[in-house]
Design a protein with these regions (language model features):
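N-terminal glycine-rich phosphate/pyrophosphate-binding loop and immediately adjacent elements
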Residues: 3-135
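Short glycine/proline-enriched loop/turn "hinge" motifs that connect secondary-structure elements
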Residues: 81-83, 197-198, 360-367
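Rossmann-like flavin
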Residues: 94-200
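Short beta-strand to alpha-helix junction loop
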Residues: 158-169, 212-232, 382-388
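Residues forming anionic-ligand binding surfaces in small-molecule and nucleic-acid pockets
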Residues: 200-211, 365-367, 376
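Helical element adjacent to the flavin cofactor pocket in flavoenzyme catalytic cores
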Residues: 206-257
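Mid-domain catalytic core of redox enzymes
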Residues: 248-364
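FAD-dependent oxidoreductase catalytic-site/capping-region signature
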Residues: 351-352, 356-390
Length: 390
């Protein structure tokens, strides 16, 4: 019996992961990437001696990656080195007004207590609840539930936590902490989920456990180490990877996939998995097979996009760390410009990353590599003049 032939669209982390599991289970797997290099948004840029992560830069939830490699009787350390950052990150609230989050709960509790008397006790209780939510979200929902029906989410454990699904992160944080600085630090992790803290259920405080409880890590050569590790594992399992393969459309006969069209050429397959955005994937299907209309997608609130800058400095940059959050402007005003009234932000918050602070080889000697990110709404007018302004 011949192996079923599966095409996977895109080469981001979900695609690279799926490819490995499918190949392990005996399928013939080919990953198709539209760009000239693999990794999706986690590609790497090298130029004039500088190395930049082009997308993801926060290595959180290390246990998830350890489990991934262990599922194939491998160890993460077989593929790349990992270092825990201290401080994990530094938050700027204004000139000479900063808070650094260090690498253990005991140190973080001292930082909180210094900022707000009594907050360390409250924080410990908050993080313990966040840990409980993390255990449920990752070990139960992620690893054990097949994700076929919403009914799976209704069980004795989730019922006991029903209030955390009704309330929101902002409400819970502001009920427990008075310091504006501490509130911002505790609300920021849910930005990784693409939503405002006021619109995110309190259950998602498990991101705070990922932050404070598990810590912030960094692969030696950047996030692309993880991409290379997953590809190396995939190749050992028989996965094929093809770049410069932009899928034009998916061909079906009845309700059965027959293959895909790429640059005017047809390639047959038995199954297709898409790691691309849902809306884009639907646009590849004939209209009669699409579940949602363009009008439907037009009414949806999209997760933020971002304006990115990759900057090579010919000097060392003082007073910054590996990860830096600049919260020196109004958080809510910027969020409104992203979600409520989409427009280019007038006074944006931003994030700055300098991997050369941890691994000097990512920049020439005496130099610094800077990655700068401004969260913005999607589908904004984009011109060189606007980019120059920022």
């Amino acid at each position: 019996m011949s192996k079923k032939n599966i095409f996977i669209i895109g080469s981001g982390f979900s695609s690279l992961s799926a490819a490995c599991y499918l190949a392990k289970n005996g399928y013939k797997v080919t990953v198709l990437e539209k760009n000239s290099s693999l990794g999706g948004r986690a590609r790497q840029l090298k130029k004039q001696g500088f190395t930049f992560d082009m997308g993801p830069s926060w290595y959180w939830m290390p246990d998830v990656f350890e489990k991934f490699f262990s599922d194939f009787n491998r160890r993460r350390s077989d593929y790349f080195e990992l270092k825990k950052l201290n401080p994990a990150y530094k938050v700027f609230f204004g000139n000479n007004d900063t808070i650094s989050i260090e690498d253990s709960m005991e140190k973080i509790k001292k930082t909180f207590e210094k900022e707000e008397a009594g907050s360390s006790v409250v924080l410990e209780s908050f993080i313990n609840e966040a840990k409980s939510n993390y255990e449920l979200a990752v070990k139960k929902m992620l690893y054990e539930m097949p994700g076929i029906s919403p009914i799976e989410l209704v069980n004795s454990q989730t019922i006991r936590k029903v209030f955390s699904f009704i309330t929101n992160i902002r409400k819970e944080v502001r009920k427990k902490f008075k310091s504006h600085r501490l509130r911002l630090i505790l609300e920021f992790p849910v930005l990784f989920l693409g939503a405002k803290s006021s619109n995110t259920p309190g259950f998602y405080n498990f991101m705070n456990f990922a932050d404070f409880g598990l810590g912030t890590w960094q692969p030696k050569n950047g996030f692309f180490d993880l991409v290379k590790g997953m590809i190396k594992l995939g190749k050992s399992l028989g996965v094929n990877y093809k770049t410069n393969m932009s899928v034009d459309s998916i061909k079906l006969k009845g309700n059965i996939v027959k293959g895909i069209n790429i640059n005017g050429k047809f390639f047959s397959c038995d199954l297709i998995i898409s790691g691309a955005d849902y809306a884009h994937t639907e646009s590849l299907l004939p209209k009669i097979y699409r579940q949602y209309s363009q009008k439907y997608w037009g009414k949806k609130t999209w997760a933020p996009s971002s304006l990115l800058f990759y900057v090579g400095f010919d000097t060392k940059i003082p007073k910054v760390e590996h990860h830096n959050l600049f919260f020196d402007t109004n958080f809510d005003d910027h969020a409104q410009d992203i979600y409520d009234e989409p427009k280019w932000p007038s006074d944006p918050l931003f994030y700055a990353n300098f991997t050369s602070k941890t691994f000097t080889k990512t920049a020439p000697d005496g130099y610094e590599n800077g990655f700068f990110l401004i969260p913005i709404a999607t589908n904004l007018k984009d011109t060189n003049e606007i980019r120059d302004h920022y």
